[in-house]
């Protein structure tokens, strides 16, 4: 069993954290985020460190203990540095471009796919085959990157499609004659 919850979360320099009951609020140079911890854990702010403790020893409480600690760490890092996810596009004629705030993708369909950028997320296209999704909320950045990838995920024969920059596609061999 993971014991990640035992480690206290250090509040980084330049970030102010506030604990009000179960609600943890973090304010930093990139913005402000909050997280409401589950009722099965207690959250305390002690000398610039956030400490999370389970209220009982049930398996459910211990699981929520580790999850709450990780979520608090994510919001503290998000308001200080932010998160970003890079996507790469492979394939002949596959490309991306920005149309105002919307992302326009040419992915081999009969029409271009237009993805509307959600609030709190920034999408940049440094090259026509590269997309950078950034924001302060780790979950939202990952969700937007997954939604863009879902339009045309990488296929195993030629590797065409949208993939994460760090993702490795396991290639298959084609049919033999």
UniProtKB/Swiss-Prot annotation:
Q: Which GO terms describe its molecular function?
A: rRNA binding; structural constituent of ribosome
Q: Is Ribonucleoprotein tagged as a keyword?
A: yes
Q: Among its keywords, does the record have tRNA-binding? A: no
Q: Which GO terms describe its biological process?
A: cytoplasmic translation
Gene Ontology CC: one annotated term:
cytosolic large ribosomal subunit
Q: Keyword set for this entry?
A: Ribonucleoprotein, Ribosomal protein, RNA-binding, rRNA-binding
Taxonomically, the superkingdom here is Bacteria
The family classification in the record reads: Belongs to the universal ribosomal protein uL6 family.
PANTHER family assigned to the protein according to its UniProt record, in alphabetical order: 60S/50S RIBOSOMAL PROTEIN L6/L9, LARGE RIBOSOMAL SUBUNIT PROTEIN UL6M
Among HAMAP family, the record links this protein to: Ribosomal_uL6_B (MF_01365_B)
Record function comment? This protein binds to the 23S rRNA, and is important in its secondary structure. It is located near the subunit interface in the base of the L7/L12 stalk, and near the tRNA binding site of the peptidyltransferase center.
Partners and quaternary state?
Part of the 50S ribosomal subunit.
Q: What is the name of this protein? A: Large ribosomal subunit protein uL6
Q: Which gene encodes it?
A: rplF
